[in-house]
């Protein structure tokens, strides 16, 4: 069974161009497993990465090596034995920091192992090999190297709640007219707000384009500075000057990255404003549709009211004719009653005379 790695992660692997000593050349088409191993037979620590069956990194860690973070997700180190500079691009700053911590830890372990080895050689005693906890003394295999990183990014889901629509109840004509006026006023207000939001949206779009141009310029400048740092680090004859320039350039890169972060936050804010403007536009369209429905309802109520008025007028005319007929009948009845009264009086007089 192959020797197990002490620590593994995944990253994109690069090497410095051996001709120009400036540009990075990718040695893997995608992220591969990069692992730390302890070679107990030679008492050294190694960084090994395989792309299939091909070893794209086989670097022995020495006490004088330094792992440098050149950005939030990129780090590099120079291997004088392999006469090259390795670069690793990680998926997050956390993975880069973890790899750098392990590099420093195993670098210190390599220094201590070297000192112990020298002391034992001076004492001409048989060296005892001590392996790191959990390591197996067996040859390295691709199967043992290509592990998986134990860092996982949780998925985030977004839940949206549907908005309840108000119920449409039948309204009397007077109430319906009041609601219609209310919706018209609301629509006028929304039109004014929509005009303001449209202007703000156009301004935000122009600002986004400007930020993107500045962002591209900053990224290009940061890439140029990264290449410059790599070039300076590879020139061993100018170590002091390289260190000074490297510090200045790293500071400049950090400032540029902070500026980029601020610009990205500004872009996110502008995107949020655009989303809000779109939401208000959707609300305006919904209110416009509701207003149209209310207007249609008003027309229906007006038709019903006109029909009721005609029916009422017809009923009133019929009642007036009935009253006139009744009045005529009453007058005739009064005449008949008067005649009957006279007849009764005359009959009474005849009875008295007889």
Swiss-Prot record:
Gene3D superfamilies named in the record: 1.20.5.1700, Pleckstrin-homology domain (PH domain)/Phosphotyrosine-binding domain (PTB) (2.30.29.30)
Record keywords: Acetylation, Cell projection, Coiled coil, Cytoplasm, Phosphoprotein, Synapse
Highest taxon listed in the record's lineage: Eukaryota
Ranges for domain WH1: 1-110
Pfam family, one: WH1
GO molecular function: G protein-coupled glutamate receptor binding; signaling adaptor activity; transmembrane transporter binding
Coiled-coil ranges (or none): 181-352
Modified residues (Phosphoserine): 306
SUPFAM superfamilies: PH domain-like, Tropomyosin
Modified residues (N-acetylglycine): 2
Region annotation Required for tetramerization: where it falls in the sequence: 290-354
Subcellular location: Cytoplasm; Postsynaptic density; Synapse; Cell projection, Dendritic spine
Subunit structure: Tetramer; this tetrameric structure is critical for forming the high-order complex with SHANK1, which in turn is necessary for the structural and functional integrity of dendritic spines. Interacts with GRM1, GRM5, ITPR1, DNM3, RYR1, RYR2 and SHANK3. Interacts with IFT57 and OPHN1. Isoform 1 encodes a coiled-coil structure that mediates homo- and heteromultimerization. Interacts with SHANK1; forms high-order polymerized complex with a mesh-like network structure, at least composed of SHANK1, HOMER1 and DLGAP1; the complex formation is SHANK1 multimerization dependent. Interacts with NFATC4.
UniProt note: domains: The WH1 domain interacts with the PPXXF motif in GRM1, GRM5, RYR1, RYR2, ITPR1, SHANK 1 and SHANK3. The coiled-Coil domain forms an antiparallel tetrameric arrangement.
Family the UniProt entry places it in: Belongs to the Homer family.
Descriptive protein name: Homer protein homolog 1
Organism of origin: Homo sapiens
């Amino acid at each position: 069974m192959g020797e197990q790695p002490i620590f593994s992660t995944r990253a994109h692997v690069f090497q410095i161009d051996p001709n120009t000593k400036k540009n990075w050349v990718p040695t893997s088409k995608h992220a591969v497993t990069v692992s730390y191993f302890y070679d107990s037979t030679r008492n050294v620590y190694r960084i090994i990465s395989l792309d299939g069956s091909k070893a794209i990194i086989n670097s022995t860690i020495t006490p004088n090596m330094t792992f440098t973070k050149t950005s939030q997700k990129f780090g590099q180190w120079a291997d004088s034995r392999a006469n090259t500079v390795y670069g690793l691009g990680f998926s997050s700053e956390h993975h880069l920091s973890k790899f750098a911590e392990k590099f420093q830890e195993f670098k210190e372990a390599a220094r201590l192992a070297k000192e112990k080895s020298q002391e034992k050689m001076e004492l001409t005693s048989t060296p005892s090999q001590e392996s790191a906890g959990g390591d197996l003394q067996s040859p390295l295999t691709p199967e043992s190297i290509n592990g998986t990183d134990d860092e996982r990014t949780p998925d985030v889901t977004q839940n949206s709640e549907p908005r309840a629509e108000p119920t449409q109840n039948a309204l009397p004509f007077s109430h319906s007219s009041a609601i219609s006026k209310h919706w018209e006023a609301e629509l006028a207000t929304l039109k004014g707000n929509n005009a303001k939001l449209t202007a703000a949206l156009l301004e935000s779009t122009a600002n986004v384009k400007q930020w993107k141009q500045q962002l591209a310029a900053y990224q290009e400048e940061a890439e140029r500075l990264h290449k410059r740092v790599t070039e300076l680090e590879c020139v061993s004859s100018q170590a002091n000057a390289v260190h000074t320039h490297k510090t200045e350039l790293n500071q400049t890169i950090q400032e540029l990255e902070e500026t980029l972060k601020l610009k990205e936050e500004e872009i996110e804010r502008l995107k949020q404003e655009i989303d809000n403007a779109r939401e208000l536009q959707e609300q305006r369209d919904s209110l416009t549709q509701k207003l149209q429905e209310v207007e249609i309802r008003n027309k229906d109520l007006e038709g019903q009211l006109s029909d009721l008025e005609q029916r009422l007028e017809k009923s009133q005319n019929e009642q007036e004719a009935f009253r006139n007929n009744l009045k005529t009948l009453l007058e005739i009845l009064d005449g008949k009653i008067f005649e009957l009264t006279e007849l009764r009086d005359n009959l009474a007089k005849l009875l008295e005379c007889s």
